[in-house]
């Protein structure tokens, strides 16, 4: 998942080091203290994996989807107006829904104070749906 502070660019290097220790010492449980966009933990091969994060948006979304995975299937790409309404009116939306909209539809994943970035026009004139891409990456 695209996420501010993402370790995606360095995931291959980080995973190689961690996986080496996990394999060498036959470690059964891996704890990711800063799961964020899940760019490391999703690549770790271990019997048990536990992801943690301090960001309540990430935690709300993870916990809710763990208990009800079909929720994300019902989400549609928000319009610009919907995005700003969700961002600016916290109390009007369920925590998991707010998290999904802000995490998946913020420009460059700048959730707090961010701006709409769910879709964009590519150089060849096509529309790229970052919201759907982020949602699908999260569901993996």
Where are these regions (language model features)?
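SAM-dependent nucleic-acid methyltransferase catalytic core
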Residues: 1-17, 23, 65-140
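SAM cofactor-binding core of SAM-dependent methyltransferases
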Residues: 27-90
